[in-house]
A protein has these predicted regions:
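Active-site-proximal region of nucleotide-activated glycan assembly enzymes
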Residues: 2-9, 178, 189-210
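Conserved N-terminal alpha-helix of the aminotransferase class I/II PLP-enzyme fold
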Residues: 3, 7-57, 78, 280
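PLP-dependent aminotransferase class I/II
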Residues: 37-39, 43-50, 55, 79, ...
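A short acidic, amphipathic alpha-helical/loop segment
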Residues: 62, 86, 133-137, 187, ...
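Conserved PLP-anchoring active-site segment centered on the Schiff-base-forming lysine
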Residues: 62-115
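Anion (oxyanion) recognition and catalysis
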Residues: 88, 138, 142, 324-327
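Active-site phosphate-binding strand-loop segment of PLP-dependent enzymes
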Residues: 102-199
Length: 410
């Protein structure tokens, strides 16, 4: 048995970034947000950018900007539990649309129906770095004048028709938390791409207060840098109290501006992120070459024009009896659909259901790591794990339609 234990996701942080963060946290390094804002405006084609203490805070603010008091937002039926936290924090009613489990993109017929049921805004989330079909959703929403918020917290350097994920919606959400591909330890950003939303950002910026120094970010980042090494990750991973890899609800807090330490780290991360994106894509391509044509384990297909950033490589268990291999970082996706989130139920409109595609993803989706700490020996172990599953023999008659039947006729 190998001692190595691979983290499912890892966001690199350099010693230089940690030093800058320590300097900002101690007050020895003066850090302004102007440089970061200008870089993000250019990178994401935004009129203005509001830096926040988390991606959840950025989404709360986006909901406040687009959904009137007592209004309703449309959410994907399968997504991160932070969407629930944002809905609770914004106090909005939620309706659900389904996802296509072939692509992780919105099921457009389901989007059409949720619009007919009545919503004031639609949130589209890119999952695991896979692009969602923003253009198709925007076309449906435009007929009713409904804004589309692009949640690119997991965009991870992916693109859609050559545009970076996060640069497409009328408002965009970024997250710089640990495990999001590019990290500052914490923090998020709200991107405005219309004059009206930019003016709303300008007014809101004055209400978020002055930034705290944020020494906790540096402690957390240093711990991540050390303990996510494959030779050490086994130690925190076996401690139940840490809940590593689990879906944990975090109650919303009043949105604040980004902490100074996180801002200092982010300045460095923005200059090096492209290298990690390229490395993830190379690892994903290698693993995908081993899956091509398999019937037992299938890869999620990007939407037309989409190029994933592969925060993780997403795979579907066509039979439904596959077990995770946590020491390899091969784990299941989110264990609940949004309608099953206990905290969301008071905010869920009557009769709303996640849909069969979302339920299928809950039951069948696996992700495997692609990050830069996946070494050659880890890649071989992952390849061996994949090989033992793609050669699994499906029951007679199930090979061709097993996955399709499972979600379309549920």
């Amino acid at each position: 048995m190998s001692w190595r234990w691979q983290a499912p996701v890892y966001s690199p942080v350099s010693p230089r970034a940690l030093i800058h963060g320590i300097g900002a946290a101690c007050g020895a390094l003066r850090t302004g947000d102007e440089t970061v804002i200008e870089v993000l405006k250019s990178r994401y084609d935004a009129i203005d950018v509001l830096l926040t203490d988390s991606g959840t805070s950025a989404l709360i603010l986006a909901l406040r900007a687009t959904v009137p008091p007592g209004g309703t937002v449309a959410y994907p039926g399968y997504a991160c539990i932070d969407l629930t936290s944002a809905a609770v924090g914004a106090g909005v009613k939620v309706r659900l649309y389904d996802l296509d489990p072939e692509t992780l993109s919105p099921d457009l017929e389901s989007v059409r129906r949720v619009i007919q049921r009545g919503v004031d805004a639609i949130v589209v989330a890119h999952l695991y770095g896979y692009p969602a079909d923003m253009g198709a959703v925007q076309a449906l929403a435009a007929d009713q004048g409904i804004p589309v918020i692009e949640d690119a917290a997991q965009g991870a350097g992916g693109t859609l028709h050559g545009r970076r994920l996060g640069s497409i919606g009328s408002m965009g959400i970024l997250s710089f938390g640990r495990g999001k591909g590019m990290t500052a330890g914490s923090g998020g950003a709200l991107l405005a791409r219309t004059p009206a939303s930019a003016e709303w950002l300008r007014q809101t910026r004055e209400t978020l207060g002055t930034p705290s120094r944020g020494g906790g970010e540096i402690v957390g980042l240093a711990a991540q840098w050390l303990l996510t090494h494959p030779l050490l990750y086994r130690l925190p991973a076996i401690l139940p109290a840490l809940k590593l890899g689990e879906m944990v609800y975090k109650p919303p807090r009043p949105p604040r501006t980004m902490r100074l330490a996180a801002l200092a780290v982010l300045q460095t991360a923005l200059r090096t992120d492209h290298r990690e994106v390229r490395a993830r894509c190379i690892r994903a391509s290698d693993l995908l070459s081993r899956i091509n044509g398999a019937s037992r384990l299938r890869a999620i297909s990007p939407v037309v024009g989409g190029k994933p950033g592969f925060l993780r490589l997403a795979l579907v268990d066509a039979v439904g009896d596959m077990a995770p291999q946590v020491t390899l970082g091969a784990v299941r996706g989110y264990p609940l659909t949004l309608e099953q989130h206990q905290q969301l139920r008071p905010f869920l409109a009557p009769g709303e259901q996640a849909g069969t595609g979302s339920a299928f993803l809950r039951d069948r989706l696996f992700t495997v790591p692609t990050h830069s700490r996946v070494g050659a020996s880890d890649a071989r172990r992952l390849s061996d794990w994949i090989a033992t599953r793609i050669h699994h023999v499906l029951p007679r008659g199930a090979r061709k339609t097993e996955r399709e039947k499972a979600w379309r006729h549920a």
